[in-house]
Amino acid sequence: MNYPHPLIAREGWPFLAGAFVISLLVHASAGFWWALPLWIITVFVLQFFRDPPRPIPSQPNAVLAPADGRIVVVEKTQDPYAGREALKISVFMNVFNVHSNRVSVDGAVEKVEYFPGKFVNADMDKASVENERNAVLIRRAADGQLVTLVQVAGLVARRILCYTKVGDNLSRGQRYGFIRFGSRVDVYLPLDARPRVTIGEKVSASSTILAELDVK
């Protein structure tokens, strides 16, 4: 299992360093009990920015979860980024989930598009169309089918980070982005994709199979 990233995401290093230094200074000057709430915050920051490696299923037609969290949508609807009817599966991440975003399928990036917007609760349906978001369209290497991944900012999460660009060749399980402090990822698939998850189910990034694609 090759995951060439630190166990604590680089995006969190400044936050962790700041929390640790402040906790240490208060501890040294005022004692443990005064510093205890700050140490608790430091531990929270540490767990929030964890970024562990995950096993990746070998099933070639599997679409993998792009994020840790809970399934809040499984429905057929319009994919506004690709202009098609699609199967939509949405993963909601709360503040206790890992917030590293990982690629669902092998393929080439056809389009990356950022949309400014609001910051309503990412658990709500309207977050998909009203909130700040970033869409990545991937053309599957195996059969040319299109998969759309959309990072959606949430009520607390106000910073979407995406590290891929048009023309990049991506692999399943590859880290491609990060969203801080609670958010959501929408996945749009071909209409004939077969969902393997249900609403309310907890999923793990790059380990849980969201759906299976028909091999063309």
Swiss-Prot record:
Binds 1 pyruvoyl group covalently per subunit. It catalyses: a 1,2-diacyl-sn-glycero-3-phospho-L-serine + H(+) = a 1,2-diacyl-sn-glycero-3-phosphoethanolamine + CO2. It holds the Pfam family PS_Dcarbxylase. The active site is at S183. The keyword Membrane applies. It is an enzyme of class 4 (lyase). Its EC number is 4.1.1.65. GO terms for biological process: phosphatidylethanolamine biosynthetic process. It is found in: Cell membrane. Its cofactor is pyruvate. Keywords: Cell membrane, Decarboxylase, Lipid biosynthesis, Lipid metabolism, Lyase, Membrane, Phospholipid biosynthesis, Phospholipid metabolism, Pyruvate, Zymogen. Its main location: membrane. Belongs to the phosphatidylserine decarboxylase family. PSD-A subfamily. This is Phosphatidylserine decarboxylase proenzyme. It comes from Cupriavidus necator (strain ATCC 17699 / DSM 428 / KCTC 22496 / NCIMB 10442 / H16 / Stanier 337) (Ralstonia eutropha). The gene is psd.
